[in-house]
Amino acid sequence: MKLQRFTLLIAAVLLFTCAVVAQELEPSAAKLQQHVTYLASDELDGRRTGTAGANEAAKYIAKEFERLGLRPAPATDSRKINVMSARYLQTFPYIGSVELGKNNVLSVQSGETLNFRAGEDWMPLGISTNKKLDLTEVVFAGYGITANELNHNDYKGTYTKNQVAVIQKGTPDGDNPHGRFTTAGQLRFKVAAAQSAGVGALLIISSEDDLKNDALARLSYDNAGLAGIPVAVISKQTAEKLANAKQITLATDVVRADVPAHNVIGVIEGSDPVLKNEYIVIGAHYDHLGRGGEGSLAPRSGEIHHGADDNASGTAGVLELARIFNTQRQKLKRTLVFIAFGGEEEGLLGSNYYVNHPLVPLDKTVAMINMDMIGRMKDRKLVIGGVGTAQEWRQLITQANMSLKTTIAANSGSAAPKGVPIVVSANGRPIMTVDPNGAFELTMNEDGYGPSDHSSFYSKQIPVLFFWTGTHSDYHKPSDTFDKINYNDEARILSLVARIVRDVDSADPRLTFTTAKSAPPRGGGFRVYLGTIPNYADSNDGLLIDGVRDDSPAAKAGLKAGDKIVKIGNREVKNVYDYTAALGDMKAGQEYVIEVLRGGEKLTLKIVPQARN
């Protein structure tokens, strides 16, 4: 009996300690709502990277860091932080301004010379390579789709650089978003198919009666590399006049310019004279999709995509954790680095830039905590990724989650509950109780890679965690609004994150990095899997690989992080879309030659794709 009482006493003391920490690390649902309401407001116009709305969001975050007393990250002589309205901004390159140049020409000879007006009869696309061509033949190639996995090829026969392919917009499936040709019918894959076929240029017939109403004719650039050939959209009337053309002169002149894009970085310095030189990164992306377009699940609406859950919720989480830890800076041993990333929706551009231009040493970065879509919790279910990237993660997460069951009730007048550990005051009233439903139902995934910013850090062998409450019907749509966020549960998620950060901060020694077990390959629209982690930044000379999944075909072939793929089989690879098109050509179990650049040297490797589950 005495042993049982002693055990309960020890348990109570431990739980009380957790409860005291919980009280110190208590996030505010009201403050979260304040941040999300502004970030997801119409005023910021969807926060598309490179736009005024995204820049206003960056200013807001920077001002919050400044108001809280966080200091800017240290800038080096070679990599200064560019200033917009605060010292907290790290600027990275982003092409956001696209305009017509002065030398756009489309003319045909068919008995008479016909000159077509750029902007009215035709429009070069933002991804078009600038070039002047004298073409001798027009070939009509259906929808311009090559999909070997579907036994479909609109390019039959042999083609030359003197030919221009004219294709229809869309796919044989019509507007069905779940059709067989959804992937192969995307613009970039049509461009890759035309380039692979060998034609000199690609013209796409508009589906609109007036070219000005066609979204494809609106100059934009996706920051994923140039097409490699001239590409343009033409009106239906222009297409009819090309039918009997004997000679075509095509010159494309698109002016692309960088616009400011930013990561926002604030620092709370640790108090330990030695450990303050180690860093814990807490991050979330603040950009979204603007008014739709690339990445939107309602691309034609033209409405503001508010991005409340994706990812104003995670950004608000960064700001609230910065507030909490700033009040306890004297208790911190290590230095906390808070980063709001730009360019995530465009392909992890901001986080990828940071890990290649770090403002604190990567080898001293002990962990990265990423929050992406943490505002729509249901039934207390929470997904945590990256658990396999450090030996200690699973135990730390489990302990922190259990501590959520503890509640301080210093002013409670209720009787002590029976059968649970308690701590009582001098008058016998409970000052700490246990809430058996306080913890989350966790799904813990091992993999450190994934479609968010933690992936960039894991590729540099840094332990990562990724917090996510799951997708929903408003994902990437205008309807992802601030009023649908569950602020109370988000505050509890941040309580869990804060506990984990506190434990990582106090750990001695630091976390032990491990290579995580990769998730099994699934879906993706292709029958094969290689296991590479592509870098989605702008590229015209090959596809850079950020990482290789363990025990994958890429790993077995000898590919390494930092390799640049320039050719797969007979297909040249200049960017991620060429690479994806190459995947569509491949068959599981068949050996292919893959050429890569490594340290300036070209290597030829052999790879055998694996079938997807």
Regions found by a protein language model. Give the residues of each.
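Noncatalytic luminal/extracellular "stalk/propeptide" segments of secretory-pathway proteins
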Residues: Q34, D45-P172, N176, V254, ...
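His/Asp/Glu-rich mid-to-C-terminal helical/loop segments that flank catalytic regions of hydrolases
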Residues: V231, R323, T327, S473-A519
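C-terminal recognition in membrane/secretory proteostasis and scaffolding
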Residues: L442, K477-S479, L496, D505-N613
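Soluble metallo-hydrolase cores and metallopeptidase-like ectodomains found primarily
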Residues: E24, S97-G101, R117, D121-G157, ...
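Metal-dependent peptidase/peptidase-like ectodomains
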Residues: N115-R117, V231, A239-E240, F341-G470, ...
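Bacterial N-terminal signal peptides
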Residues: T7-A19
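N-terminal capping segment at the start of a domain
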Residues: P27-A52, L68-P74, A86-L89, N213-N223, ...
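Acidic/histidine-rich catalytic neighborhood of metal-dependent amide-processing enzymes
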Residues: G185, F189, P260-N263, G290, ...
